[in-house]
Amino acid sequence: SIYERCELARELINR
């Protein structure tokens, strides 16, 4: 889902 993609992307940006 788009929301899941956003969550994953957010984690990558946060690292």
UniProtKB/Swiss-Prot annotation:
The keyword Transcription regulation does not apply. GO terms for biological process: defense response to bacterium; killing of cells of another organism. Signal peptide: none annotated. Its EC number is 3.2.1.17. It catalyses: Hydrolysis of (1->4)-beta-linkages between N-acetylmuramic acid and N-acetyl-D-glucosamine residues in a peptidoglycan and between N-acetyl-D-glucosamine residues in chitodextrins. It is found in: Secreted. Expressed by the venom gland. It is an enzyme of class 3 (hydrolase). GO terms for molecular function: lysozyme activity. One of its GO terms (cellular component) is extracellular region. Keywords: Antibiotic, Antimicrobial, Bacteriolytic enzyme, Glycosidase, Hydrolase, Secreted. The keyword Nucleotidyltransferase does not apply. It comes from the Eukaryota. Belongs to the glycosyl hydrolase 22 family. Lysozymes have primarily a bacteriolytic function. This is Lysozyme-like peptide. The lineage of its organism: Eukaryota, Metazoa, Ecdysozoa, Arthropoda, Chelicerata.
